[in-house]
Structure formats: structure tokens, C-alpha cells
């Protein structure tokens, strides 16, 4: 597949998601990194976003809760180029009813090559990267080229 580049601005659009058993870890991580997160545009699935806002006072654009379609909403935003990175603390020890949605979200994040952190260590590495604080580019699929090929 052909690729092109997408610019990520200095102020990133960050999606925050956590399974129930991981919500407190994500809230604590957001509290610890509040100063670093504040200048960015933050999105979250419903319950997670409300809890983060209550505990940190960070401004959050809340979507639906994951099981009610929030993971799917995030996937759509990623495909539209409206999310720059995903912080998703998921619980590998417990299945959730919306596992297919979670898998679809991870797949679409990979297709569109956005940085994904699935645990505290990776999230710490991601936000300590120089690219987090500056404008950068990521390579993404060239959808127009893909469509042109498919329509031949």
C-alpha cells in the first residue's frame, strides 16, 4: 500500500481509555502527568473521561462508554485523522463483553500508525519522547491512492 504523511501538531489530540480494573491506574497516571497533558486536547470514553475529569480537573471531550460504542467512536476519529495518540490501559486478565470493539480499535490505531501505549511504562516512554512536545509527522496509508487502485 502506498503511504503519505500526516502532521501531528505540537498540541496533540490524545485518546484516554481504560478497562474497569485499570481506571485507577490511568487516573493516577493522568494526575502525575497533569502538567504535561494540560496543553493537549484530551478525548476519553465516557466513564473513564468523567472519572479523570473529577480527579484531575483536566478538560476531557467525553465519548460514549466503551461498551456502549465509545471504542467504535474513537476508531472513527482515528480513521478521520482526529486522534494523534492513544493511551489505552487494558486488562489482559479479564475479558470484556466488547472485546471485538477493543480489537477493532487496536487494529485501526495500527492501520493509521498512531502511537499507542497500553500500560504505564509505555505511556511514560511516549510522553517523555521529544516528539510529544513538538510538531512531528507520522506515515499513514494513502487512502486516495488506495481508493484509486481499487477503482481501476
From Swiss-Prot:
Residues 6-152 form the MGS-like domain. Gene3D superfamilies: Methylglyoxal synthase-like domain. Its EC number is 4.2.3.3. GO terms for cellular component: cytosol. It is an enzyme of class 4 (lyase). GO terms for biological process: methylglyoxal biosynthetic process. Signal peptide: none annotated. Substrate binds at residues 19, 23, 45-48, 65-66, 98. It catalyses: dihydroxyacetone phosphate = methylglyoxal + phosphate. PROSITE patterns: METHYLGLYOXAL_SYNTH (PS01335), MGS (PS51855). GO terms for molecular function: methylglyoxal synthase activity. SUPFAM superfamilies: Methylglyoxal synthase-like. The active site is at 71 (proton donor/acceptor). InterPro entries: Methylgl_synth (IPR004363), Methylglyoxal_synth_AS (IPR018148), MGS-like_dom (IPR011607), MGS-like_dom_sf (IPR036914). It comes from the Bacteria. Keywords: Lyase. It holds the Pfam family MGS. Catalyzes the formation of methylglyoxal from dihydroxyacetone phosphate. Belongs to the methylglyoxal synthase family. NCBIfam families: MGSA, PRK05234.1. This is Methylglyoxal synthase.
